[in-house]
Amino acid sequence: MTESEFLKQAEATLDQIEATLEELANTSDLDVECTRSGNVLEIEFIDNGTKIIVNSQAPMQELWVAAKSGGFHFKAQGEQWMNTRDATELFAALSQMVSQQGGVEVVLRDAG
């Protein structure tokens, strides 16, 4: 994958995560605020002040996630982002992290 292809896929994924969480904040009990600065998406849980940070790392061609449960690296495999350690898909992993930190069961899905 070229750097421009990576950046395009990473940007689309960050956009999708942000849009999905904003929709969930409006339609469920999830109290979350998303802030985007370039390649960094900060997800703040209002009730407890914890955060999840998702950012793209172009040199490594990975998305990195920092959450209360730890740090995780995801590499593109086709249209999906897979955890480099245990092959968990990004949206499945984020669903679990957001549910844990937000105290509300949510499911995030990759629209791609």
Swiss-Prot record:
Gene3D superfamilies to which the protein is assigned, alphabetical: Frataxin/CyaY
SUPFAM superfamilies for this protein: Frataxin/Nqo15-like
GO biological process: iron-sulfur cluster assembly
GO molecular function, one term: ferric iron binding
Keyword check for Iron: yes
Gene Ontology cellular component list: cytoplasm
Domain of life: Bacteria
Keywords in alphabetical order: Iron, Metal-binding
Alphabetized InterPro entries for the sequence: CyaY, Frataxin/CyaY, Frataxin/CyaY_sf, Frataxin_CS
Family designation: Belongs to the frataxin family.
Protein task: Involved in iron-sulfur (Fe-S) cluster assembly. May act as a regulator of Fe-S biogenesis.
The protein's name in its UniProt record: Iron-sulfur cluster assembly protein CyaY
Source organism of the structure: Herminiimonas arsenicoxydans
